[in-house]
Amino acid sequence: MGNLFKFSLNCIKYRSENLEKSKMFYQYFYFHLTLSIVLIYGSDIGKDANEHMSSVPKKIIIEGTRQKRQVVTKLFSPQWSNAKVFYCNADSFSKLQLKKLKLKKNSDTVKRKLMKFAMNFISSQTCVTFEENCTISTRIKFVDSTFCASYVGMINSVQEIYFPDWCMRFGSAVHELMHALGVLHTHARFDRDNFLNVNLNKDDEDDSNFEIVSPPFSINVVPYEYGSTLHYTADVSGTNSLLPKQMEYYRTLGNRRVTFYDMLTINTAYNCKCPSELLCANGGYTNPSNCLECICPLGYGGVLCDRVVACSVQLSADSYWKGSWISVGSSVLRDTTDPVKAFISINAPKDKIIEVKIVKIENFSCDSGCNNNGVEIKYMGDPRITNPIICCENQVDPSNKGYKAKLNPLLINIYTFLGKNKVTFHYRYVNERLSSYNKTTNGYDNYEYYA
C-alpha cells in the first residue's frame, strides 16, 4: 500500500489497579506505528451544498443534499468489467482551497494522495484494481467541488467523483469510491426499518438519500452495520432523524472508519475469490488480493487471524473487579489517514464470561459519528461487526452493570485523531459459562459465534 508521510513511536501509558486488594502497578507500552498522514479537515457529510444543486447531473448520490429520485436503484450494478476501475484527476483536483489551513510541503497534491491511499486500501483487500488512464472513455474523474458526490456503479462514460475540502477524510474517500463501485448507503437497505426509526425534517422527506431500495433492485450480503462507512449520522436531517433501534449505537452512526463488512460487501459484489481458501480464524477469510493471507476482523492478526494484533496490551481478569486506565495519542494534533490505535486484550480462564465497563473518558471530542476519537468494546459474539462506539461523557455510567462479552479474550479498541485521550475501565470474569449460550450465524455465511 502506498504511503504518504510517516511517523512512528507512540507511547501508550497504562495503569492497572486491583480494586479488591488495592495494589497498583504501572507499565509503559511503547509500540511502533507507521501511519500515512494527510490533512483531515471539516465536518460530517452534509454541509453547504444546496446552492450548487443546479449543476449536478442526475443519477448521482450527493451526500447531505436534497435530491429527488436521482439515484441509480441497483446495489451492485452496473459493475466495472474485470473489477478494473480507470480514473483520472482533474487539473483542479490537487490543492486544498482553504487558505486558512497552512500546510507544509506536498500540500499541492494532498487530495490526490488521499484518494490514492483510499484506492490502494480497497485494492489491498479486494480483487478491485485502479489504473490511472485519462484517455479511456469509461473512467472516474476526480473533481474538486463544494459538494461530496458520486455516481452509483459504472455508467459507461466519464463519471465524476466530487470531493471538496470538507470531505477530506479517509473513510469519506472510501465511501465515495464504494458508490462508484455500485454500493448504496446502508440506510437504503430494504431491511433498514428493522434497525432504524426514520424521522426526516420536511425538506428531506423526498430526498432519495433516505429512500429504501427494495428487491430486485438491491440485495443484502452482510448484516446491517450501524458502523459502516456508508451510513449517515443519526442527526443528518435534524435531531434523531436516523434513530437506531439499539440506542447504544446512536453515536456510532456516521463513523468513517472502514469496516470489515464494508470490504466484504465489495468482495461479494465482485465475486472476489482465491483458487483455494485458507482456514482463517475469528471470522476472517482469504484475502483475494493476496491469497497467502487472511483478511482479519479489527483487532486480530497473524496470517490466519488466530491471534490478537501484536501491539495489544494484555490483561488478565480475575473473579473480582480490577481497574485500569490507558492513555492513547500525544499532545500534538496529528492529521492522519488512519487514527492512532491501541488494542487491549482482556483474558480469562477458558469458557468464562468477561465483564467490562467504562468508568471515565477524558479529553474526548464528542461528535456525531465519533470520528475524532472513540472507544469500542468488542463484546458481541460476532468479532466482525462494529460494536457501539463511545466518545461522549454522557455515554459513560460508572454505576451500570457493564458489558458481558461473548468473546474470550475480549478486545477493546481505542482510536484518536486528536491529541491524547484517556480511558478508565473496570473488568472481571463472572461465574457463568460462555458455552451455556447458543451459537448462531449472521444469516449471510456459516461462521458460528455465541449469541
UniProtKB/Swiss-Prot annotation:
It holds the Pfam family Astacin. The active site is at 176. It is found in: Secreted. Its EC number is 3.4.24.-. It comes from the Eukaryota. The keyword RNA-binding does not apply. Disulfide bonds join 127-272, 148-167, 274-291, 296-305. GO terms for biological process: molting cycle, collagen and cuticulin-based cuticle; proteolysis. GO terms for cellular component: extracellular region. Binds 1 zinc ion per subunit. It is an enzyme of class 3 (hydrolase). Residues 267-306 form the EGF-like domain. Residues 70-273 form the Peptidase M12A domain. Zn(2+) binds at residues 175, 179, 185. Glycans are attached at residues 133, 363, 438. GO terms for molecular function: metalloendopeptidase activity; zinc ion binding. Keywords: Disulfide bond, EGF-like domain, Glycoprotein, Hydrolase, Metal-binding, Metalloprotease, Protease, Secreted, Zinc, Zymogen. Metalloprotease. This is Zinc metalloproteinase nas-16. It comes from Caenorhabditis elegans. The gene is nas-16.
